[in-house]
């Protein structure tokens, strides 16, 4: 099999990278009706598998779970989760032949084995669904021509998909139809019904492509979403301890600082996050972020280049074939870092303290979000897609660190995201060490004193923050989500 993206000519590559259309609410007037009365079989009962299935069942669809014989015989976690929630469970051979839609929600590295097993069992004219297009785009999986291939990709962890649905809302979602597999022209109808069944249509749906979803998703998770948070955590902790800060306090400031800072990001973008600072601190955070962008731009560009070319995927798949040797080594090394093993701080840190003493962390967030967004857009990815894969998902990942530090983040994210995270963070930490050595008092761990500021400089910095393209598209998309939630609640 060959990387699908690399089989396309340049015009086709650019067309698929740039496919992104915000869909209107009226396009989902039929809800999930296209799939009602049809059999939907989900393969895999992890976080996405279980929670999407619960939402789809509550939306009136016929949902069952196909598991491997040994998972059923040994009553593994997937079997327990499905049966405890009242779902029908069976083997591939029992359920797949009757399925109208088979949804593959297993981890990326299992996709090829799963598809090779289920494809011969699928009836003529059935549909195959994914929530991430890696298997189609990067592995280059060939699917029978009578099978329709679609994607519904919620831009949140599975638990959030369920919780937002229960609130009467949903999470922003990308949908796509694989252009090589839409024999009956029904792919978009299937994808729309599936997205509606998960509640995604109530938060906003982007019509995208498998290519755009994969390339932007990989870039976001490797850089700002996971790699930058990991590198930033390790660098900031070590710097604080070197300066004499109590390791327990330093650990808490960082562990919960990311979540507190990015909560402002979620509500009002980079503008609101920066507005939480005093004027002198805002000017300093802006200056630090500009320095960071200059230093890190080549690293972000290298990751994007390796994602576009397929270099990243081929390297990771080689590690799959080598029993995840690199991944497991990096995971073990991360677990032994000083940040991960630091004692817990029992005292309280007030919300504003995280901002006042985390100026560098805010600068890292701003620089990372803007760089990821800019690099994706420069590579042909549309701004809305780049926003969802950078700023939008960052608070969700920061929340995992608040739960159990980097360990929890790396457990929750996919192995694909974890592998990319380590690639980035292992390069970023040494890259930023000279920068860290030049920090000034007040950049981290101590508040910057109030003082006079130059009005013209403050005016220009505020304008630069607010006029960045990610702030413009973010304001539009956040406004749309707020309006949609208001409509959903009123309904």
Curated annotation (Swiss-Prot):
The gene is ilvC. It catalyses: (2R)-2,3-dihydroxy-3-methylbutanoate + NADP(+) = (2S)-2-acetolactate + NADPH + H(+); (2R,3R)-2,3-dihydroxy-3-methylpentanoate + NADP(+) = (S)-2-ethyl-2-hydroxy-3-oxobutanoate + NADPH + H(+). The keyword Magnesium applies. GO terms for molecular function: ketol-acid reductoisomerase activity; magnesium ion binding. Involved in the biosynthesis of branched-chain amino acids (BCAA). Catalyzes an alkyl-migration followed by a ketol-acid reduction of (S)-2-acetolactate (S2AL) to yield (R)-2,3-dihydroxy-isovalerate. In the isomerase reaction, S2AL is rearranged via a Mg-dependent methyl migration to produce 3-hydroxy-3-methyl-2-ketobutyrate (HMKB). In the reductase reaction, this 2-ketoacid undergoes a metal-dependent reduction by NADPH to yield (R)-2,3-dihydroxy-isovalerate. It is an enzyme of class 1 (oxidoreductase). Residues 15-208 form the KARI N-terminal Rossmann domain. Residues 209-344, 345-484 form the KARI C-terminal knotted domain. Mg(2+) 1 binds at residues 217, 221. Pathway: Amino-acid biosynthesis; L-isoleucine biosynthesis; L-isoleucine from 2-oxobutanoate: step 2/4; Amino-acid biosynthesis; L-valine biosynthesis; L-valine from pyruvate: step 2/4. GO terms for biological process: isoleucine biosynthetic process; L-valine biosynthetic process. PROSITE patterns: KARI_C, KARI_N. The active site is at residue 132. Keywords: Amino-acid biosynthesis, Branched-chain amino acid biosynthesis, Magnesium, Metal-binding, NADP, Oxidoreductase, Repeat. SUPFAM superfamilies: 6-phosphogluconate dehydrogenase C-terminal domain-like, NAD(P)-binding Rossmann-fold domains. It holds the Pfam family KARI_N. Its cofactor is Mg(2+). Its EC number is 1.1.1.86. This is Ketol-acid reductoisomerase (NADP(+)).
């Amino acid at each position: 099999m060959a990387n699908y993206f690399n089989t396309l000519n340049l015009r086709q590559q650019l067309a698929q990278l740039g496919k992104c259309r915000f869909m209107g609410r009226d396009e989902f007037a039929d809800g999930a009706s296209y799939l009602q009365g049809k059999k939907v079989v989900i393969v895999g009962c992890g976080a996405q598998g279980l929670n999407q299935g619960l939402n789809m069942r509550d939306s009136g669809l016929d949902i069952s779970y196909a598991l491997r014989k040994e998972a059923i015989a040994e009553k593994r976690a997937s079997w327990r989760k499905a049966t405890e929630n009242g779902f029908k469970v069976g083997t591939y051979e029992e359920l797949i032949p009757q399925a109208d839609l088979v949804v593959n929600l297993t981890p990326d590295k299992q996709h090829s084995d799963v598809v090779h097993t289920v494809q011969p069992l699928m009836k003529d004219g059935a549909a195959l669904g994914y929530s991430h297009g890696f298997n189609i785009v990067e592995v280059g999986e060939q699917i029978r021509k009578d099978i329709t291939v679609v994607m519904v990709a919620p831009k949140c962890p599975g638990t959030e998909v369920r919780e937002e649905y229960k609130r009467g809302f949903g999470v922003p979602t990308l949908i796509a139809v694989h252009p090589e597999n839409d024999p009956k022209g029904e792919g978009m109808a299937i994808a729309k019904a599936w997205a509606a069944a998960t509640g995604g249509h109530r938060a906003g749906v982007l019509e995208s492509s498998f290519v755009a979803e994969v390339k932007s998703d990989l870039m976001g998770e490797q850089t700002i979403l996971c790699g930058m948070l990991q590198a930033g955590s390790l660098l900031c902790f070590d710097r604080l301890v070197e300066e004499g800060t109590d390791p327990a306090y330093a650990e808490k400031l960082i562990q919960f600082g990311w979540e507190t800072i990015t909560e402002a990001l979620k509500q009002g973008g980079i503008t609101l996050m920066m507005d939480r600072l005093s004027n002198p601190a805002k000017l300093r955070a802006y200056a630090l972020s500009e320095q960071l962008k200059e230093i890190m731009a080549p690293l972000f560009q290298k990751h994007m280049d390796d994602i576009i070319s397929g270099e990243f995927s081929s390297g990771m798949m080689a590690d799959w074939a080598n029993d995840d040797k690199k991944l497991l080594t990096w995971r073990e090394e991360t677990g032994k870092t000083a940040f991960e093993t630091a004692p817990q701080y029992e005292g309280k840190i007030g919300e504003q303290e995280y901002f006042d003493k985390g100026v560098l962390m805010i600068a890292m967030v701003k620089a990372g979000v803007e760089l990821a967004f800019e690099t994706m857009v420069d590579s042909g990815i549309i701004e809305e897609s780049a926003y969802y894969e950078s700023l939008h998902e960052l608070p969700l990942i920061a929340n995992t660190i608040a739960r159990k530090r980097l360990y929890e983040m790396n457990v929750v994210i996919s192995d694909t995201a974890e592998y990319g995270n380590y690639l980035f963070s292992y390069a970023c930490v040494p890259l930023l060490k000279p920068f860290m050595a030049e920090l000034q008092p007040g950049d981290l761990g101590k508040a910057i004193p109030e003082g006079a500021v130059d009005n013209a400089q403050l005016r220009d910095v505020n304008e630069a923050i607010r006029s960045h393209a990610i702030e413009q598209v973010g304001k539009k998309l956040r406004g749309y989500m707020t309006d949609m939630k208001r409509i959903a609640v009123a309904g």
